Amino acid sequence: MKKLKVALLANAKENAPNFEELSEDQWDDLDSTKTINAIVEAIKSGGNDCEFLEGNITLVDNLIKYQPDICFNICEGHFGDGREAQVPAILEMMRIPYTGSKVMTLALTLDKPMTKRILHWHELPTPEFQVFERTDEPLNDDLRFPLFVKPSREGTGMGVSGKSIVKDENELREQIAKIFKRYKQPALAERYIEGREVTVGLVGNLVGPVARRLPHDENLPRIQTGLHFFPPMEVDLEPFKESDVVYSNRLKVDLADQLNYVCPAPLDVEMIDDLNWYAAAVFRVTGALDISRVDFRLDASNNWKPYILEINPLPGLSPGISDIVIEAAAEGIEHHELVNMILDTALRRYGIKKQASINY
């Protein structure tokens, strides 16, 4: 059996556009050359050929030249409200299989308010919120301070700092204005949940009939068939409590190698069971595929009730730094094994036979 030709599609930071109007954190969610090289080598270690292709306007020509059997997609995109969906749209036009979620899911989940509307409709717990298109929009009567304010369509904690927690109208308007000026997009304000922040990573695909709403039957299975859940992770923010009371962009980017990642997070079995169930539910209602990471806040004032913040169907895969990589490592799964788990999951979904596999 011949080796598969796998194209790693990514947006490298060193290849990103550069001009004066860009904010200083514009490309924080793009991948480093180190990460890209690590994923290429991981795919090769699974017995397949792999080549990195930049996910920009050169992609179509390079795909025609390389003729991949499947693409391993981690492209974040450069511009546009649906930038994470742009490369998958090209791949679907060219009828090339790829890992991860499809166009609609990637466009949806980049838009945090739209995702929260979907979660709310499905009766999944997410903090009450309001979207601000103007700085002078009145605050809804049902929202109370403190609120948490962030850009509607950014990742990697961009636009998030200790000042994102606003306690009055003046602070709210100040943060909204900053987001408008810096990111040129609507601001999302949601009820601030005082408590702990944890994240759950998962690989796989749902099998069989799955409820779209929370089941009322307590005897139904709590863990969805077909998904592999990694141990939940929590970041210890105690050493940074004077400067960063939340998991900010500064911590995620500038200080990532100095953080204490607690994984598995100290949670009881019932809480982990609930988090996994909610993660599976979000995975289902957003149409995610192959891999995702779901972020939660646990409400200290309400018996640590979980609230869903967002789902990331394109979680970072930087060795030793990205959340889902750390979660997998806590289970004894090394970086190259995780990468091949994701690839193998997509290959099974497409019915593509692989050359080799790794025992996990």
Predicted regions mapped to residue ranges:
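Active-site nucleotide/adenylate-binding loops and adjacent lid/helix of ATP-dependent enzymes
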Residues: 1-10, 64-67, 107-196, 204-209
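ATP-binding N-terminal substructure of ATP-dependent carboxylate-amine bond-forming enzymes
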Residues: 1-98, 104, 109-110, 133-139, ...
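A short beta-strand motif that forms the metal-chelation/ATP-contact edge
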Residues: 6, 70-72, 199-204, 304-319
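Short acidic/His/Gly/Ser-rich catalytic and metal-binding motifs that mark active-site loops
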Residues: 15-19, 155-158, 242, 255-256, ...
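Hydrophobic beta-strand scaffold residues
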Residues: 50, 97-98, 126, 147, ...
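ATP-dependent carboxylate activation and anion-phosphoryl transfer catalytic cores
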Residues: 120, 266-360
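Phosphate-binding site of ATP-dependent enzymes
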Residues: 169-277, 303-307
